[in-house]
């Protein structure tokens, strides 16, 4: 039997909510609604090598992923993507880092969807 390792961790949002389950549900819903578009937009910016958009999208994602606990898995990747985009360099490295970000976000989405 294969073991499934979860990528999400709701400890941070649970602590932040202080027992407000509606808040937790709302934050998860926001992640489920917004993250697929964030991934799509970042992927398109990477394909177009639009470093300004890459920088902007990766910066925004850094602030949203802690709510579902995936910052420990992809936070550094997003920091590195933003840094490389700021320097307008490393397109291939950005693509590689993005693949990990995308995979983790897809796993998180699948874990959290109702």
Language-model regions: role of each:
Residues 1-114:
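Two-component system phosphorelay core
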